[in-house]
Amino acid sequence: MVAVHTDVVGSLLRPSELLAARGRLESGEISEAEFKPIEDAAVDAAVALQQDAGIEVVTDGEMRRLSFQSGLPDAVDGFGEVPIEAYLWGEWHGEGAVGDQATDRPPRLGVHETLHRRRHIAAEEFTYLRARATAIPKVTLTSPSLYANLWSPDVSRDAYP
């Protein structure tokens, strides 16, 4: 057998239980306190999947994020709506066969105001992952170039000329 080095870049498919719970959270059917154990269980399953496969560096599967792009805008003030079709092409609507749900692209990816950190970008994700993983923990962060590409003269110039 040939040994091949692998790393998980970031996102794994979110389990249907997590998707359903996130929908109930957004609609107000459950509280954040009721949602958290479901989210934690999804992270635990993602870590176990990677470790059972022998992957040496593991992520939380980005179970706590709407998308790989949402970590920074969730932690930093100053982002707002911007048309992103020119930069993020393709459909975000998965096939029912893989349990995916239709979803809109993440909001608030464009810079509207000077950026100010509200909380650490990935401290919660990393702290939880490090406590659960026996493998090397890793949290994926979005490249700054994504947000540079989403600079818009219409909405960003006042903050960053």
Model-predicted segments: where are they?
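Domain-level signal for soluble alpha/beta catalytic cores
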Residues: 1-161
